[in-house]
Amino acid sequence: LQRVTGEPEPLMRTVIYDEASDYMAAGLLHPPELPSLIWNFSAARHDHFPAPDLRRYHAPASQPLGYYFNVQFTNTGSHLADGEGPWKMEQNHRMLLDCGPDVRLSIVNSGNTREFPLTLSAHARMMWDFTRYDSERFLAEFCARHFGEKHGPQVAALYRDYFNAYWQQRKSDIPGFPRQYLFHDLRVARAARDLMRATVNPVPEAELLGDRGIGYYRIVPEDSGAATKVEAVRLGNQQAAARFAEVAHRCDTLSPQLDAQDRGFFDQSLRLQARLMAAASE
């Protein structure tokens, strides 16, 4: 890099992800603290919040930092329906800023761009003016811009209720961090697959819907008033389905009132996602 760029200290980054994150948290990995090396931390796997390595690190003022956040996660996360939302995305980055002041880089992962316009737009706005960004203000402005001053507040309320409809399969363990654990659409699909397979190839109930050593499901039955993980999945998703169905019904009522162009965007970015999650969770 020095030869190609001609710079004595070309800017580089190292992505601290997966096992590297575990090694950092355990104190086994020590990247050099250089003003030309961005320490690019990553949200935790399967559920997207700052991992222990970031929460335990306090960077020198001269150490540049970055962050990798999964809006979509093609394993157990959001895939066809936005699950994380602007508030959670913002809180992840605010916790990065608590670690050190020199934030240089932010990466959001989203393969299906069409399904995540709200959260991706929120991220773009946040990075444009990180200091002044606020998710509530962004949501109000986003909805007013796309759906007009008359209907914008109604759509904003629907977005809030949609994101809060997700089943939270265990209680948050980071103080002041709501919606830390979510049962995303792919978790619903994986759980249905595992339960159907178990009817053909029975396995002990204690092994069903486990974490597989990587936090695959992260179900705590008692947090949902259940005795087993299977019962928790049934109860949690039934309740989530009712919440999503209520949001979908309100979307059905509002959609015909919107202008044609606004209606198409509304239907694809919110109404259909609420209906999908209602049907999948039922």
Model-flagged regions — what are they?
Residues L1-E282:
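Substrate-binding groove of N-acetylhexosamine-processing glycoside hydrolases
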